């Protein structure tokens, strides 16, 4: 009979632990937090040192009663919640809500970073008490977020419109997206020209290669700004003599990346699998907590997924090296194990990187047991871990400099300089298992090889290839690049990236267009108000400083109430000034539309889901209609106007204004120019390329045509 009680967060984790611990243990799930701040009020007594007033949600009372009953029959109690601040706080709240600390039953905290037999056994052999430093760091974060959210939101409701909200980290993320949009709209493209020449050692075209112009003969960089300049240079090059000036062979070594931490897993899952951060973390949690593997039962497949440490246990490194030697051969093993112990300066407690719990459990072996998305994420984690302990990849690179001279030229320069390069894989190393998304993007940038060239070799000119280009604005953030930017600025921690990205979309401050974040008008308005009246709240530097304070609280170096006391008075002072000085905004705009029911003019309003048309006779007439933004492109089916729309999932798409009579719709942004091959509709494809929806013809766009249309800023 079970006489030892173990409490965890989820039923899946409970099932996996039950299998490991055996019948003498009873494992119960709390289903997350059992106490929280109240939904209907601030729940913080500011005047009494920021004392939180926690409540037990109605749905948790039954769970608490069940845990108390199980605890009364147990000889000992183990709190086995997740190994981070949130997990520590859940354990503490469990104790407070159930009053387990008032009983004589021994109660201890156990911590493990993977749900395996060895890790769990070690944790139960080394129990400890609840770490109040970690609990207080979580409490401080929760109260900070509550103060900002509950104090700012009423202001936005009164001064802008009902239903708006602000958050400590989310508002910084929205500001970053809004600032990037402003950069894009302010950007003025500059014309420039790239000129390449095709050269060969002989008249045989098969052995030819291309070299790019980069300077005049004395090494001064050459900037060609218009077609006339390009034509003059091209004319010079047609009669020039080409000679090899320098040949620099070099061996390039590319080292594998460390195993995943939370942010890099989210970034690579977005780049390679197109998983959102939220989806990635949900799947990773399933892999961590355990999935049924046939006769094996429920098995934890990866280590804990919220971490900012690249450290890997020595036993896992040994297992990986043994596996690599057997499967790939000793040439794929570096002489010494690779160590990735360096952590971000703000890294939380002693975590491990995200890795498989058993290297020998290869992805193909799990195919019968995991669903497709679970298998894809597991394989990504498995390959990254294995590759991290493999030999470096080796490349033979050659950089060649070529001088073009024209003795008969009367130009003031004395020729031009060109460069060509090649990179040939000599040893694939870790890349037989895993390539980063950046490596995949770089493929094809260099020719596979150059002919054997020596200094002084004369080359045969075979043609000139001038290309008009335009400088590009900074790209909009994707989930991957926004997470990377937040991490680099020290904003948020492993547990906050996914919720932040989800929240800013759910509150309609940003939309996704072709996988890139674009602010809504509502997001721009709210961000501008916060930037003007609450500059510290939306300042990335200040937010990063607050995160560092939370880290110090977790280490026991800073009092949590002191951090709140330092933050709150200036925040309240700023809030009082905003209430006094911020005028109520009228977001209503006139339109040319007439109400179909009462013939009054219709006006443009901004709601939770973006712009819409409403009758100016409200409340007498409550007619509303969707507001469609024309993009200046005709529908290929009925020649109506194509308009920008937002789907129920908050994704941008483009449809016909004659809907429902015409149901044409497409996800990619249509381009005004017709297909040069068949005159059908072109849509944005990748980067500065467009693709025909009919014949699939691809064409390179000029200037800013490839940019998504922005919201007026």
Task: Describe each region flagged by the PLM.
Residues 2, 82-84, 161-165, 249-258, ...:
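Conserved short loop/turn motifs at secondary-structure junctions
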Residues 16-20, 66, 89-97, 119-123, ...:
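Alpha-helical scaffold elements adjacent to nucleotide-binding pockets in ATP/GTP-utilizing enzyme cores
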